[in-house]
């Protein structure tokens, strides 16, 4: 085996990526740890992999996420030091939201900086992730009392690239309600159509347009077609034979929240918003999905009791098919995240026909046009209130998000190139933005 895949937190998007690589990259072997006790994985996984990974002279490339302290592993296993070491950042700890600055554990961010210094290639899933990490290094290191190292960003930046997280969008046609099928016919060859634009960027900062041009507009099933948008804002209505039926008008708005049950996803804001809608006697249904871990914020049990009459689905759905069915039945997908560097769940929901509402912050402006972003909790509440009163506005809207830009079929070759040991440069010029 020439490619060694290591994942210290084998769950969620970390698991999705590793599974794709295992399926698609020849001559690879993987070693993982379960997605439990994240903090302990970050602290101790290097020691585990030191013992778990057998010596093998055929290894040429080592790929791992930034949960693992790569510097520790290389020190513990000098035989791995000569490999091409690729470090992938799903998230970074330098800007992880904490309630008070004193609560930030210096060690996690410090580990990631050390890992970057020993890696040969450092890859981020978004420009926001990369720039927020690199621009925070200097400030982060100033928390040291003295003898602070200098110029770490200058040493790390030349290694850095952006390679968006790849999603394998399944054909969900059979799960779509009639009004979604009529508006958005799905063909498998459309779902897997190559993206028209490059997906690799160097570490130079870049700007992103607020709205994709019409020729980039994709329908929610991923079909890349050149046509004028039938809807640009939630205030424009489009004629639709089925959506005009009384049944569609009377069915309550279905809101889905498909995120980890942790404080950094700000469930407090989401449930506070729903309770305001309830107090205003607005009609809606809600599905709260996403993974749960050891410590679940109290707001979930409190909200479940208060919103019991509105709940469609509650809790993690182990079956991916069942999860997709719920997304296909929903109308609006909401993010209230305070910590997000890509957002697989939001894009999967868009693929299933949901209208996205995201904060105008973090990675979201990089992926979603301005019409899907809100700046304040009041704006989020106002948008949902409008959709509750007129759910057909969300149901008739054609979402303008370039899903093919994030598909495995578009990005797979770039990952395969990344994992080639003999590539003098990581990518050819045609892959560089």
From Swiss-Prot:
Bias kind Polar residues: ranges: 221-239
Chain residue ranges for the region called Disordered: 194-244
Broad EC category: transferase
GO cellular component, one term: nucleus
Protein function: Glycosyltransferase that specifically catalyzes mannosylation of cytoplasmic tRNA(Asp) modified with queuosine at position 34 (queuosine(34)). Mannosylates the cyclopentene moiety of queuosine(34) in tRNA(Asp) to form mannosyl-queuosine(34). Mannosylation of queuosine(34) in tRNA(Asp) is required to slow-down elongation at cognate codons, GAC and GAU, thereby regulating protein translation.
Official protein name in the record: tRNA-queuosine alpha-mannosyltransferase
EC identifiers of the protein: 2.4.1.110
Inactivation phenotype: Decreased postembryonic growth, characterized by shortened body length.
Catalytic activity: queuosine(34) in tRNA(Asp) + GDP-alpha-D-mannose = O-4''-alpha-D-mannosylqueuosine(34) in tRNA(Asp) + GDP + H(+)
Glycosyltransferase is among the record's keywords: yes
Entry keyword annotation includes Transferase: yes
Natural source organism: Danio rerio (Zebrafish)
Family recorded in the similarity comment: Belongs to the glycosyltransferase group 1 family. Glycosyltransferase 4 subfamily.
Keywords for the protein's UniProt record, in alphabetical order: Cytoplasm, Glycosyltransferase, Nucleus, Transferase
GO BP field: central nervous system development; regulation of translation; tRNA modification
């Amino acid at each position: 085996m020439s490619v060694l895949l290591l994942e210290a937190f084998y769950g969620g998007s970390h698991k999705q990526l590793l599974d794709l690589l295992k399926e698609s990259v020849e001559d690879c072997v993987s070693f993982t740890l379960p997605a439990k006790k994240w903090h302990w994985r970050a602290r101790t996984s290097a020691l585990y992999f030191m013992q778990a990974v057998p010596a093998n002279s055929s290894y040429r490339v080592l790929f791992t996420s930034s949960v693992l302290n790569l510097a520790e592993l290389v020190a513990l296993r000098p035989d791995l030091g000569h490999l091409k070491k690729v470090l992938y950042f799903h998230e970074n700890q330098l800007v992880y939201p904490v309630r008070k600055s004193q609560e930030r554990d210096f060690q996690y961010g410090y580990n990631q900086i050390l890992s970057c210094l020993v890696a040969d290639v450092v890859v981020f899933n978004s420009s926001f992730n990369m720039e927020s990490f690199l621009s925070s290094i200097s400030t982060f290191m100033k928390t040291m009392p003295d003898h602070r190292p200098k110029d770490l960003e200058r040493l790390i930046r030349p290694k850095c690239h952006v390679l968006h997280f790849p999603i394998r969008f399944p054909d969900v046609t059979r799960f779509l309600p009639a009004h979604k099928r009529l508006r958005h016919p799905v063909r498998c060859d459309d779902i897997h159509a190559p993206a028209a634009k490059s997906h690799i960027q160097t570490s130079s900062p870049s700007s992103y347009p607020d709205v994709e041009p019409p020729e980039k507009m994709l329908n929610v099933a991923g079909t890349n077609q050149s046509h004028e948008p039938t809807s640009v804002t939630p205030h424009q209505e489009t004629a639709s034979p089925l959506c005009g039926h009384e049944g569609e008008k009377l069915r309550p708005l279905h809101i889905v929240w498909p995120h980890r049950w942790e404080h950094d996803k700000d469930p407090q804001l989401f449930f506070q918003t729903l309770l305001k809608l309830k107090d205003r006697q607005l009609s809606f249904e809600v599905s709260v999905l996403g993974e749960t871990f050891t410590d679940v914020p109290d707001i979930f049990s409190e909200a479940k009791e208060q919103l019991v009459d509105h709940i469609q689905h509650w809790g993690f759905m182990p079956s991916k098919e069942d999860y997709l069915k719920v997304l296909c039945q929903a109308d609006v997908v909401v993010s209230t995240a305070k910590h997000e560097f890509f957002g697989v769940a939001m894009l999967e929901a868009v693929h299933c026909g949901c209208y996205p509402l995201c904060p105008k912050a973090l990675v979201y402006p990089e992926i979603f046009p301005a019409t899907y972003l809100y700046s304040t909790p009041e704006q989020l509440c106002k948008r949902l209130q409008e959709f509750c009163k007129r759910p057909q506005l969300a149901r008739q809207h054609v979402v303008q998000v370039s899903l093919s830009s994030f598909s495995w079929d578009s990005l797979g070759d770039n990952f395969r190139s990344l994992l080639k040991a003999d590539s003098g440069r990581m990518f050819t010029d045609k892959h560089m933005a």
